[in-house]
């Protein structure tokens, strides 16, 4: 193997460029710990707090979480399978659908997500560390950002290795914590089924599904170095169950903690984690918080890493760039700085802002995931001319009207069904009593339209181009060491 990053500790060089076969490495099972631990952190726990904090029963909240996780994780897992087959990071794969310039539409939204999540992540991490190790929250925000920056700069191999070790620790420590939940006293009526409220159920479902779908823009970034002979099925399963188990576990624990705290709920779950943990022994709550914060640091590094790839893709759309280590350092650093400024300037209403942000992510990426997956699995069936993706005048064009139009129409169809708390309630959502079913509208509209629009695409001709350019692509990629 002649990998540009053959062992943990060396700075990764590659970014948006194709990973040649000579540099492919890793086992498909590595995806399980990575996506388990990416979800097993405090921000995920906060997703499960939302409907409980609005008065829903624990039973219906947990059911909404389970359904939302099982549905939302499907999409991100299907995206993950693209990485080993194409050898490309996730968002650059949007060019065949949206065009060389047109893909900027979704890259802008993706970058907002990366930076936005890091604002929430570092605030939560800062509050958790301030609770356990004391000191100003903002100081801890800076420290956690710097640690995540170092991990992101070293890159792919360190991220995988760190997530594996953290997974082992999390299963043990959080397993003990979860068992403790069965032995604490809950308010009367906590486990009653309660009245089903469609708006609360769909609201929790939508936020959970949106959170899981939001990983779709990451997943190929962390599978693209794997050999192409790992099967799509295995890539899907390791990604799906790693993410679903980690995410579902944390969200359900969040809902249980909110139900246990009742009116004394602190708004983030940090205080409840600490208090319940101390039922094991004094100080165990601090151990749980520190470990959960390390999970936040790891996912913050993922956001910096993905944000860097998205920035480089955007720059490449206007001016052809040669991916280098220096370019990675600058773009990772800029992404870290941007989210740090946002975290230091953020307001106090964490849970309300986080809920609205998750809904925004869901709205923006439902049409994209439909377009991208229909293109990969149904239209082009995984056959792409990789070199043409980096050709500003190539066969995929500068503006992919099919993808752009399907996306915009799909998004527009969702607007009447939006329900974003006090910010906006669409007429259809209002007629449904506040139930937000935009997920079930945007996905089929965008997907079906894109399929119809692409009926005229000559996929056979594109495949011939891909086969003709394959050898040259490998040689060019190997020269970039």
What are these regions (language model features)?
Residues 1-58, 201-206, 224-234, 457-481:
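Membrane-interface "cap" regions at the ends of multi-pass membrane proteins
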Residues 26-45, 178-184, 193-259, 282-304, ...:
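Hydrophobic, membrane-embedded alpha-helices of multi-pass small-molecule transporters
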Residues 41-44, 67-75, 110, 114-119, ...:
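Selective recognition of specific alpha-helical transmembrane segments in multi-pass small-molecule
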Residues 52-63, 128-141, 157-166, 275-276, ...:
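Transmembrane helix-loop boundary segments of multi-pass membrane transporters
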Residues 91, 95, 123-140, 227, ...:
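Helix-loop-helix connectors at the membrane interface of multi-pass transporters/channels
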Residues 126, 139-181, 193-196, 237-242, ...:
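Membrane-interface loop-to-helix entry segments
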Residues 314-348, 395-414:
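Loop-to-transmembrane helix boundary motifs in multi-pass membrane proteins
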Residues 368-449:
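C-terminal membrane-solvent junction of multi-pass transporters and transport-like membrane proteins
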